[in-house]
A protein has these predicted regions:
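Core, highly hydrophobic multi-pass alpha-helical transmembrane subunits of bioenergetic inner membranes
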Residues: 1-210
Length: 210
């Protein structure tokens, strides 16, 4: 069943970079060269979530399979898959907004980007409330809620940045290109982290023990 995990893993990243790579890579290249501080911040976040993924792998290969078979694992084909499509679509709208913004076109793509992010948080809240286990049940449950919950916090922070961008562009008429670039780059980083979480916490575990 692991073949399904690898199919979903590579397919999800292929879809993400196919729809976003050409839209924003050329503008972010110069941004990376001129903003080392924010680059280091993103790298530190990568190491943080790397610790979460390392803990997950340690639990997977340290516990007996009966441990996971005793859990009612969450299906990856429900809200988790829907949330993945939401973030992919939100990221695409963010890229379209950025390209149009560079051409002095102020459209509503940023609104769609924000609304899809809010819907993601709402669905995540619903999933937590109807989950079959709690954060204090097992070690895997703690990693599951910590990883997805902290990612949800990053989504919330990213939405705050995007809402401020929307407000400053359409109402204040005064904004910094650096802040817009940081906000959108942070949003894409949140999307990539979710792809790892979705493939490891949902797909990998589900197909490994079902």
């Amino acid at each position: 069943m692991l073949i399904f995990f690898f199919i979903f893993f590579f397919l999800s990243f292929f879809i993400y970079f196919y729809f976003t790579n050409e839209l924003f890579m050329y503008s972010y290249l110069q941004f990376f060269l001129n903003s080392q501080f924010f680059y280091y911040f993103i790298v530190s976040e990568v190491f943080f979530f790397g610790g979460v993924f390392w803990s997950l792998f340690w639990i997977i290969f340290s516990y007996d399979s009966c441990f996971f078979l005793s859990l009612s694992l969450i299906s990856p084909f429900g809200l988790a898959l829907f949330n993945t499509f939401l973030l992919l679509a939100s990221s695409s709208f963010g890229c379209l907004f950025h390209v149009n913004y560079l051409n002095n076109i102020h459209d509503i793509n940023l609104i769609f980007c924000i609304l899809l992010g809010l819907l993601f948080l709402f669905n995540q809240f619903i999933e937590f409330n109807f989950c079959f286990y709690t954060i204090s049940d097992f070690s895997f449950c703690s990693i599951f809620f910590f990883g997805t919950g902290f990612h949800g916090f990053h989504v919330f922070v990213g939405l705050v940045f995007l809402i401020f961008c929307f407000y400053s562009i359409f109402y204040v008429k005064y904004y910094f290109i650096f802040f817009i670039n940081c906000s959108l780059l942070y949003w894409h980083f949140v999307d990539v982290i979710w792809l790892f979480l979705f493939n490891l916490v949902y797909i990998f575990i589900f197909f490994l023990y079902n």
